[in-house]
Amino acid sequence: MARKKVRPRLIAELARRVRALREQLNRPRDSQLYAVDYETLTRPFSGRRLPVRAWADVRRESRLLQLLGRLPLFGLGRLVTRKSWLWQHDEPCYWRLTRVRPDYTAQNLDHGKAWGILTFKGKTESEAREIEHVMYHDWRLVPKHEEEAFTAFTPAPEDSLASVPYPPLLRAMIIAERQKNGDTSTEEPMLNVQRIRMEPWDYPAKQEDKGRAKGTPV
């Protein structure tokens, strides 16, 4: 009976899967990658020193999993926010936790990943996603008795004004330019004042939309 030949493409695919599995097994755990030496303020795994501006927070504040590890069920359903958001924005910014996956190799279960529904500047996203910067030392847990007051928000009425007349000098210049080009239009020139919608600089990016973060997480 003839031996069945294995197609080269199947062998290549099997080799690719084996390499991917080895890379996954050799990948450093979160507890290794984001461990901090609090005396030298460096990350032992990479040898990089934390930014100077982060030193005070590293000594006083907590990482997200440090807070959640003290709670039943790792705080599922609770609200968490960041100190930087409290300083930067008057509108409520927080995550409502939907899933937590701690790194069980960490000594105090203070590393891992978390997912939640983001509310940023009063606007709530429709789907849960992975929370970024969980290793930063600036997370705050919203007390249960303060959640209702913390999430209360009345959005300001949007400005419906779309355009305004040009100043007299600019209006005269535009009309003169029209006449020079042979334009006989009698339409009044108007200046568009609609704002361009842009995400704030500290809006949490989706993990699938960005590459591997560069620099030293704090």
From Swiss-Prot:
InterPro entries: Ribosomal_mS34 (IPR032053). Belongs to the mitochondrion-specific ribosomal protein mS34 family. Its main location: mitochondrion. Keywords: Disease variant, Mitochondrion, Primary mitochondrial disease, Ribonucleoprotein, Ribosomal protein. Required for mitochondrial translation, plays a role in maintaining the stability of the small ribosomal subunit and the 12S rRNA that are required for mitoribosome formation. One of its GO terms (biological process) is mitochondrial translation. It is linked to Combined oxidative phosphorylation deficiency 32: An autosomal recessive disorder due to deficiency of mitochondrial respiratory chain complexes, I, III and IV, and characterized by delayed psychomotor development and neurodevelopmental regression. Additional variable symptoms include poor or absent speech, inability to walk, and abnormal movements. GO terms for molecular function: structural constituent of ribosome. It is found in: Mitochondrion. GO terms for cellular component: mitochondrial inner membrane; mitochondrial small ribosomal subunit; mitochondrion. This is Small ribosomal subunit protein mS34. It comes from the Eukaryota. PANTHER family: 28S RIBOSOMAL PROTEIN S34, MITOCHONDRIAL (PTHR28589), SMALL RIBOSOMAL SUBUNIT PROTEIN MS34 (PTHR28589:SF1). Residues 180-218 are annotated as: Disordered. Component of the mitochondrial small ribosomal subunit (mt-SSU). Mature mammalian 55S mitochondrial ribosomes consist of a small (28S) and a large (39S) subunit. The 28S small subunit contains a 12S ribosomal RNA (12S mt-rRNA) and 30 different proteins. The 39S large subunit contains a 16S rRNA (16S mt-rRNA), a copy of mitochondrial valine transfer RNA (mt-tRNA(Val)), which plays an integral structural role, and 52 different proteins. Residues 196-212 have a biased composition (Basic and acidic residues). Pfam families: MRP-S34. The lineage of its organism: Eukaryota, Metazoa, Chordata, Craniata, Vertebrata.
